[in-house]
Amino acid sequence: MTIKVAINGYGRIGRNVLRAHYEGGKRHDLEIVAINDLGNAATNAHLTQYDTVHGRFPGEVSVDGDAFRVNGDRIRVLAQRNPAELPWGELGVDVVMECTGLFTSKEKASAHLKGGAKKVIISAPGGKDVDATIVYGVNHGVLKATDTVISNASCTTNCLAPLVKPLHEKLGVVNGLMTTVHSYTNDQVLTDVYHEDLRRARSATMSMIPTKTGAAAAVGLVMPELDGRLDGFAVRVPTINVSLVDLSFVAARPTTVEEVNGILKAAAEGELKGILDYNTAPLVSVDFNHNPASSTFDATLTKVNGTLVKVSAWYDNEWGFSNRMLDTAVALAHAR
């Protein structure tokens, strides 16, 4: 069964979802049939073909009337503000990827269902009313056929949860604090402007900017047994892509660097293969650009003092997350 997918909102995540689909070998279980975005179609085609972060698309993108042609495939292009008025039923859309950042609650995202879509995945942390928050590889098995609107969590939660899962299963995570050293994103500013958050008011290109994140606490939505045990904050830094999670936690028993690294190596080679990668080389952030894994554990940075453990993982906050959107779409459509 081929899942028909539509993308609503063609920004960083929307474009990378499309590129990941084609660059990953074009999955035969999924077909992108439509894109809805208020931007000019020719401009969006150009931005798909040429990307500052991920380079030139290794294929062909052109505009054909009311559609894109991507490697010969025709993808309908729409420009409708109200999701309820989109022709999802006419196009046979199984799953809408809601990538605008505007419809992040079940109530708002359900407008796509009124348009005829069967399911919706929000590409951001969802409201409390969503049917599930999913980190593929960690808890996608909880999906049910009755789920209609789900959240794909955040890029940082998608990095953190695969790191925490095997550690909690083998060592027990009593509690922990996380810092994500995060590349700047489009919700920041190039030069100082008025903002209610005085740190967010400052130039993204000139400073390290501490700010809040719900990524650590959201692990409790994915692994309920850890609800309330994790917290943290973000430091936005002047790099365009790739971020680093730094997690310190108290284990339920004493451990060693060797045991911690062994646990995560086994997970990366086993149940989390393709989701969690394992690195032993002395690399820097740019080396993980365009890496499709959700999380790359860096074994060279592990520190242990009795029950106090520090682990670190790199993640391409655009590319890894976009690949998981595709995985989650297929899992949601096939949920029983």
Swiss-Prot record:
Keyword Flavoprotein: no
InterPro entries attached to this UniProt entry: GlycerAld/Erythrose_P_DH, GlycerAld_3-P_DH_AS, GlycerAld_3-P_DH_cat, GlycerAld_3-P_DH_NAD(P)-bd, Glyceraldehyde-3-P_DH_1, NAD(P)-bd_dom_sf
Xref: Gene3D superfamilies: Dihydrodipicolinate Reductase, domain 2, NAD(P)-binding Rossmann-like Domain
GO terms for MF: glyceraldehyde-3-phosphate dehydrogenase (NAD+) (phosphorylating) activity; NAD binding; NADP binding
Keywords: Calvin cycle, NAD, Nucleotide-binding, Oxidoreductase, Plasmid
Binding-site list for D-glyceraldehyde 3-phosphate: 154-156, 185, 200, 213-214, 236
Active site (record annotation): 155
Record keyword RNA-binding present: no
Signal peptide per UniProt: none
SUPFAM superfamilies referenced in this protein's UniProt entry, alphabetically: Glyceraldehyde-3-phosphate dehydrogenase-like, C-terminal domain (SSF55347), NAD(P)-binding Rossmann-fold domains (SSF51735)
GO terms of biological process kind: glucose metabolic process; reductive pentose-phosphate cycle
The organism's place on the tree of life at top rank: Bacteria
Involved pathway(s): Carbohydrate biosynthesis; Calvin cycle
PROSITE patterns per the UniProt record, alphabetical: GAPDH
EC number(s) given by UniProt: 1.2.1.12
PANTHER family per the UniProt record, alphabetical: GLYCERALDEHYDE-3-PHOSPHATE DEHYDROGENASE 2 (PTHR43148)
Family assignment from sequence similarity: Belongs to the glyceraldehyde-3-phosphate dehydrogenase family.
Subunit annotation: Homotetramer.
Function of the protein: Could be involved in carbon fixation as a component of the Calvin cycle. Catalyzes the oxidative phosphorylation of glyceraldehyde 3-phosphate (G3P) to 1,3-bisphosphoglycerate (BPG) using the cofactor NAD. The first reaction step involves the formation of a hemiacetal intermediate between G3P and a cysteine residue, and this hemiacetal intermediate is then oxidized to a thioester, with concomitant reduction of NAD to NADH. The reduced NADH is then exchanged with the second NAD, and the thioester is attacked by a nucleophilic inorganic phosphate to produce BPG.
Name of the protein in its database record: Glyceraldehyde-3-phosphate dehydrogenase, plasmid
Natural source organism: Cupriavidus necator (strain ATCC 17699 / DSM 428 / KCTC 22496 / NCIMB 10442 / H16 / Stanier 337) (Ralstonia eutropha)
UniProt lineage: Bacteria, Pseudomonadati, Pseudomonadota, Betaproteobacteria, Burkholderiales
Name of the gene: cbbGP
